[in-house]
């Protein structure tokens, strides 16, 4: 797609701007002015990026030209007569000449005696030689640092084709000494940039490698389960400590005479006493079992959770279900006492109406007979004792209705009132309400039922229709 210039964008229609934004991957459902601004900003950014890329390509091309210039200067230095040079500069090894070549060289020097300016040239070459070799060494070190995959460069040897060097060049005699320079060139020309610089061209990442790395970082299912178990263990042990701290060691209520039969509450029946006796221990034991054997599951059934202050008014109500935080005041349990020594205070209150029924219990109390003597007489109501005992219900607050004013039966006056009402409002007839309709239906059903029963018993002769 051809990207328009910034001036052309002003003449575009809104639909064209939207299509352009969609093609560029921008948000298209904006207002016209905002969309135009966003497109201009995006195009400016793209143009700036392109300019930066071009500058980098130019710099990389110039950096590629530098090694070419160096290699060409080396070639020129090699082409010049180097008869007087017997040793290479820097770390290079000595060049041993064969006697034939030495003789030829002597003959040539005798024939061609170099003039004075040539000596100056030689001195210039000798002076320039070390600087060039130093630059070359630096360049080689850089290449060796950046390109690890490239093998170590073989030792170069300056000289003619018939010179033999000791080392690798002695084995590979056919190799050209200028091969490493080509390798260096290829290092730079392939990437179009120096090895130190990063490429700005966006490449697609290898998602497989990324996913594998992420997957290796993730913990396995077994590790996750172990971590969760440890977490639940700590949580459960903390909750158990809280529950044990919240349980107050309550004192037993002093023994009082039994109230009248009418005032016997649901909580004081023998069955409920048995339930309340067994319940705190059962609750504690279940908590312990859950804490030790099954740590991974949290049980919220026995926990007393108060979310707000709105539940405080229910504290004085004695519910049948005893949570760990709110137990019945009649049960006296101590944490240090064993299971057999748990004594119920309500046993002192209990007397049987007729004969005492023998109940088989695992822990029979022997001191019960001395505290509450069994009598066949009718118990006498004690007002003070009943008033001192806590109530099992919430008492009524506020004004009571006046005593003696009962609701009168107005069914006799209903017809008269209705007639008078209709006389007053004859111009606006009142619609039948639902309550009146219900009463009418109930009356009709009653009459129908009586009629059917009368026909069945032969009291009313069935009308033939």
Curated annotation (Swiss-Prot):
Which parts of the sequence carry Phosphothreonine?
A: 204, 269, 337, 361, 372
One of this protein's GO BP terms?
Answer: mitotic cytokinesis
* Biased composition annotated in UniProt, kind: Polar residues: 56-75, 154-166
Q: Where is this motif: KEN box?
A: 407-413
State the post-translational modifications: Ubiquitinated. Ubiquitination by FZR1 may lead to proteasome-dependent degradation of this protein.
* Domain of life of the native organism: Eukaryota
GO cellular component terms, alphabetically, are:
chromosome; cytoplasm; microtubule; mitotic spindle; nucleolus
As for subcellular location, the record says: Cytoplasm; Nucleus, Nucleolus; Cytoplasm, Cytoskeleton, Spindle; Chromosome
Q: Name the segments for region: Disordered.
A: 44-123, 148-207, 252-294, 308-338, 396-454
Q: Which Pfam family, any one of them, does this sequence belong to?
A: NUSAP
The free-text function statement in the UniProt record for this protein reads: Microtubule-associated protein with the capacity to bundle and stabilize microtubules. May associate with chromosomes and promote the organization of mitotic spindle microtubules around them.
- Record note on quaternary structure: Interacts with DNA and microtubules. Microtubule bundling is inhibited by IPO7, KPNA2 and KPNB1 while association with DNA is also inhibited by IPO7 and KPNA2.
Query: Which family does the record claim for this protein?
Result: Belongs to the NUSAP family.
According to the UniProt entry, the note on domains is: The KEN box is required for the FZR1-dependent degradation of this protein subsequent to ubiquitination.
Listed name of the protein: Nucleolar and spindle-associated protein 1
Q: Which organism is it from?
A: Bos taurus (Bovine)
Q: Which taxonomic lineage does the organism of this UniProt entry have?
A: Eukaryota, Metazoa, Chordata, Craniata, Vertebrata
């Amino acid at each position: 797609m051809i990207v328009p210039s910034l001036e052309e964008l002003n003449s575009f229609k809104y639909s064209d701007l939207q299509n352009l934004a969609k093609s560029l991957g921008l948000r298209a459902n904006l207002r016209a002015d905002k969309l135009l601004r966003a497109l201009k900003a995006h195009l400016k950014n793209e143009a700036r990026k392109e300019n930066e890329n071009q500058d980098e390509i130019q710099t990389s091309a110039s950096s590629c030209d530098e090694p070419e210039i160096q290699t060409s200067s080396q070639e020129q230095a090699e082409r010049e007569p180097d008869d007087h040079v017997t040793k290479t500069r820097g770390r290079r090894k000595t060049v041993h000449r064969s006697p034939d070549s030495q003789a030829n060289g002597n003959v040539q020097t005798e024939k061609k005696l170099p003039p004075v300016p040539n000596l100056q040239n030689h001195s210039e070459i000798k002076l320039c030689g070390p600087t060039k070799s130093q630059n070359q060494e630096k360049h080689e070190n850089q290449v060796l640092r950046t390109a690890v995959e490239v093998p170590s460069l073989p030792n170069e040897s300056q000289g003619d084709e018939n010179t033999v060097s000791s080392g690798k060049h002695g084995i590979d005699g056919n190799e050209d000494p200028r091969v490493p320079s080509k390798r260096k060139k290829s290092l730079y020309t392939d990437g179009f940039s120096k090895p130190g610089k990063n490429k700005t061209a966006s490449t697609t990442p290898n998602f497989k490698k990324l996913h594998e790395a992420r997957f290796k970082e993730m913990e396995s299912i077994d590790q996750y389960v172990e971590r969760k178990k440890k977490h639940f263990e700590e949580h459960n042990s903390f909750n158990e400590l809280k529950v044990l701290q919240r349980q107050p060691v309550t004192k037993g209520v002093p023994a009082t005479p039994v109230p009248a039969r009418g005032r016997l509450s649901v909580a004081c029946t023998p069955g409920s006493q048995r339930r309340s006796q067994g319940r705190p221990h059962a609750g504690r034991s279940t908590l312990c079992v859950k804490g030790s054997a099954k740590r991974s599951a949290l049980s919220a059934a026995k926990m007393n959770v108060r979310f707000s202050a709105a539940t405080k008014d229910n504290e004085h109500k004695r519910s049948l279900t005893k949570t760990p935080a709110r137990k019945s005041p009649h049960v006296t349990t101590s944490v240090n006492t064993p299971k057999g020594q748990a004594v119920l205070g309500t046993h002192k209150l209990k007397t049987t109406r007729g004969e005492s029924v023998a109940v088989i219990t695992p822990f029979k109390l022997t001191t019960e007979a001395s505290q509450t003597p069994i009598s066949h007489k009718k118990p006498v109501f004690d007002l003070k004792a009943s008033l001192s005992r806590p109530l099992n219900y919430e008492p009524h607050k506020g004004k009571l209705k006046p005593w003696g004013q009962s609701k009168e039966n107005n069914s006799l006056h209903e017809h008269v009132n209705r007639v008078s009402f209709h006389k007053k409002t004859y111009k606006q007839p009142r619609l039948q309400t639902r309550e009146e309709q219900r009463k009418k239906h109930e009356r009709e059903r009653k009459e129908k039922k009586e009629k059917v029963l009368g026909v069945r018993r032969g009291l009313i002769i069935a009308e033939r229709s």
